[in-house]
């Protein structure tokens, strides 16, 4: 196997000690049959992920989500929590990090044996088409994706289409979320009752192509006029035509991708594998 280990570098003792343990384990169990490279998160580039059979991410959820933007859908990713809450209440929750130093040796041997469970994790991506006809995509988001006015104090204006439905809206931006990313932002962007009502829709149907969408700070009148355009659980593409002087798409709170008035932005899902023991 051609393996890349990417690690969080913050000079804290718990992370440095864990990294030394991880390296020791890999030297012992992978030295003969596998090639292993190590890179700190700050120095890694997209080219570093090319032709890898496995990417091991050592850190927390934020480390994994930021790196996932550089990883293609066919590359398996293994998350190792460098500071789990089981040993420290101030540690990382590690929703995506199924392994830790205590279990890493058994977990990685399971991967080497081809016996790991592979989860297909959906990721959100936006396709932007400019008024001049140029088309480009944003980095994929594991948790959520925001489409909004670059000036957050100004309203986000756009024409919204999903399936046969259409609506013109003025909101604080559209927040899209994967099923697994609902706890990152979506759940905190609405009231408890609103979130409960939205979750009721997921009980009837749930596929790998479904995602959440919420129009933030939408007026009561607009909510009543087009409930589907306020909050939804859908497997249909959502397309907006911007009526903002300048807007942006932000995947996972990371890089900003800007667009101008008249651009069309389509949000869609695709899946990527993640091995779990």
Label for each model-derived stretch:
Residues 1-58, 70, 90-117, 135-139:
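ATP/NTP phosphate-donor binding region
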Residues 47-53, 72, 169-170, 231-234, ...:
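Flexible, charged surface loops at secondary-structure boundaries
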Residues 63-67, 185:
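Short glycine/serine/threonine-rich phosphate/pyrophosphate-binding segments
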Residues 68-82:
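A short, gly/pro- and small-residue-rich
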Residues 83-172:
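Catalytic core of DAGKc-family lipid kinases
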Residues 168-219:
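Gly/Ser/Thr-rich active-site loops/lids in small-molecule metabolic enzymes
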Residues 225-261:
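A conserved acidic, glycine/proline-rich C-terminal tail/linker
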Residues 270-277:
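Conserved small/polar residues in nucleotide/adenosyl-binding loops
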């Amino acid at each position: 196997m051609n393996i890349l280990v990417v690690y969080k570098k913050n000079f804290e003792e718990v992370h440095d000690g864990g990294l030394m343990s991880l390296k020791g384990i890999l030297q012992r169990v992978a030295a003969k049959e596998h090639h292993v490279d190590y890179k700190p998160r700050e120095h890694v580039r997209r080219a570093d992920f090319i032709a890898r059979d496995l990417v091991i991410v050592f850190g927390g959820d934020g480390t994994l989500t930021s790196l996932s933007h550089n990883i293609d859908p066919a590359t398996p990713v293994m998350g190792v929590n460098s500071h789990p809450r089981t040993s420290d209440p101030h540690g990382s929750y590690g929703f995506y990090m199924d392994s830790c130093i205590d279990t890493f040796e058994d977990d990685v041997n399971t991967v080497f044996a081809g016996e790991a469970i592979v989860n297909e994790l959906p990721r959100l991506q936006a396709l932007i088409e400019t008024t001049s006809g140029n088309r480009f995509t944003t980095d994929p988001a594991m948790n959520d994706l925001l489409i909004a006015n670059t000036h957050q104090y100004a309203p986000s204006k756009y024409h919204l289409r999903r399936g046969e439905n259409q609506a013109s809206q003025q909101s604080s931006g559209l927040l899209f979320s994967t099923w697994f990313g609902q706890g990152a932002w979506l759940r905190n962007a609405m009231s408890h009752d609103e979130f409960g009502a939205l979750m009721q829709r997921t009980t009837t149907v749930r596929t790998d192509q479904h995602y959440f969408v919420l129009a933030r700070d939408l007026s009561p009148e607009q909510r009543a006029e087009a409930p589907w355009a306020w909050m939804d659980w859908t497997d249909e593409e959502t397309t907006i035509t911007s009526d903002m002087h300048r807007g942006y798409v932000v995947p996972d709170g990371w890089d900003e991708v800007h667009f101008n008035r008249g651009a069309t932005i389509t949000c869609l899902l695709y899946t990527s594998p993640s091995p779990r023991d």
